[in-house]
Amino acid sequence: MFITFEGIEGSGKSTALQGLAAWLQQRGHGVAVTREPGGSRLGRTLRSILLDLGNTDITPEAELFLYLADRAQHVAQVVRPALDEGMVVLSDRYADSTVVYQGYGRGLDPMMLRQFNDVAVGGLWPDLTILLDLEPEAGLNRALARNIREGMHAAEGRFEAESLAFHTRVREGYLTWAALHGGRYRVVDATQSPEDVVRDVVGIVAAALGDVSSGEAVSGRTGA
């Protein structure tokens, strides 16, 4: 099973993903945890370019193709091999991030981006996508505090430096895209405590796996 986590900056994707990974491992599932950009050796180099605060002059088109290169390598070297081994793959961001950030955020055509991504991933789309949703102001405050705390403000702060208007477009784009692809999307309220977010995510995945023994309520919602 291939599960991706999406959301604006500071939405808590990494925390929710790690909580889900622990739950899956406790139930005997093999789990591969990965991320974009940076899930492969080449991807780590591309991540340093894409997220560096000093690279504010990257054009939307150049940004797009750097992300596509990262993704193609990631799928070939990490995602497909793990799925072939029967593992549950959890990815912090995937192709939907490009559709939303470069499409709704930067103004490129989302449907064109979907087609480009189809080529990059060889048609491999997630079985389930969890969108962690909250207001952009709250997410940015979280993300900026995290980057400063971890000493990553310059190395990984390029998107946090974007305007509030940009992040508002991204958030609205995510909700629009989730509604268009409601069959695989579940939206979780990311304003809750981390523990409550993990509980909701576990409930969603337990239902998808048919794990009725988890005792967790499913409280995500499907896009229309």
From Swiss-Prot:
ATP binds at G7, I8, E9, G10, S11, G12, K13, S14. Its EC number is 2.7.4.9. PROSITE patterns: THYMIDYLATE_KINASE. GO terms for biological process: dTDP biosynthetic process; dTTP biosynthetic process; dUDP biosynthetic process. GO terms for molecular function: ATP binding; dTMP kinase activity. The keyword ATP-binding applies. It catalyses: dTMP + ATP = dTDP + ADP. Pfam families: Thymidylate_kin. One of its GO terms (cellular component) is cytosol. Keywords: ATP-binding, Kinase, Nucleotide biosynthesis, Nucleotide-binding, Transferase. It is an enzyme of class 2 (transferase). The keyword DNA-binding does not apply. Phosphorylation of dTMP to form dTDP in both de novo and salvage pathways of dTTP synthesis. This is Thymidylate kinase. It comes from Nitratidesulfovibrio vulgaris (strain ATCC 29579 / DSM 644 / CCUG 34227 / NCIMB 8303 / VKM B-1760 / Hildenborough). The gene is tmk.
